[in-house]
Design a protein with these regions (language model features):
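Catalytic beta/alpha-barrel core
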Residues: 45-47, 71-77, 93-101
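Conserved anion-binding
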Residues: 102-168
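Glycine-rich, proline-tolerant flexible connector loops at the mouths of alpha/beta enzymes
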Residues: 39-68, 164-168
Length: 189
């Protein structure tokens, strides 16, 4: 199991304030604490306007790398920002995320293909989160085909099945159980 520290996200009010105020100490402290707690990757998500996102990601990534060697998880809804942030990282990390929605997978996979970068893959497409096991498996296989096309080993992908909560969808548990049952073990890939 991998643990992704998610406390360096501009959608968190205290982090948003630190970004706006250029409070380097808060960013460093959050990075240090998550690394000490055993995070495998530290997710860095600026959650700012796209015209300043890349420079904000660079600032945050540089601060994180001053205090820890824990690999970075580059996180943005923008493929352009993710791709631009990869060179700021001192070592390969994780891109969060691709799916079959839009063209993000075709913009990120070529960049990480010949590297040791890993990637979170969300099981959704242009129709949203699949509501059946069959549709989720179709999306899963589509992502795996794209990975194969770009020469990305399955072991470099971390599949997020996007399980919806039981409080919003009573079939959620059944869908997740079926996904687990029908998915090949990583050892079998």
């Amino acid at each position: 199991m991998i643990i992704i520290g998610e406390k360096l996200n501009g959608s968190i009010p205290s982090v948003a304030k630190a970004i706006a105020d250029k409070d380097a100490e808060l960013i460093k402290e959050r990075a240090r604490k998550q690394a000490e707690a055993g995070a495998t990757f530290l997710d860095v998500c600026a959650s700012v306007e796209e015209d300043v996102e890349v420079e904000t990601l660079k600032w945050m990534i540089d601060l994180v790398q001053e205090v820890t060697d824990t690999p970075i998880c580059v996180d943005s809804p923008s493929a352009k920002s993710c791709v631009a942030a990869i060179p700021f990282c001192k070592r390969p990390g994780l891109v969060n995320s691709v799916s079959l929605e839009g063209d993000k997978i075709d913009r990120i996979f070529p960049v990480i293909a010949d590297t040791d970068w890993e990637c979170v893959a969300l099981l959704c497409d242009n129709d949203g989160i699949p509501d059946s096991v069959e549709r989720r498996m179709k999306v899963f296989h589509g992502i795996m085909e794209k990975a194969k096309e770009y020469g990305i080993a399955p072991s470099r992908l971390h599949i997020d099945p996007l399980v919806v909560t039981l409080s919003t969808d009573e079939t959620a548990l059944t869908v997740f159980a079926c996904l687990l049952y029908t998915s090949p073990s990583p050892r079998d890939r």
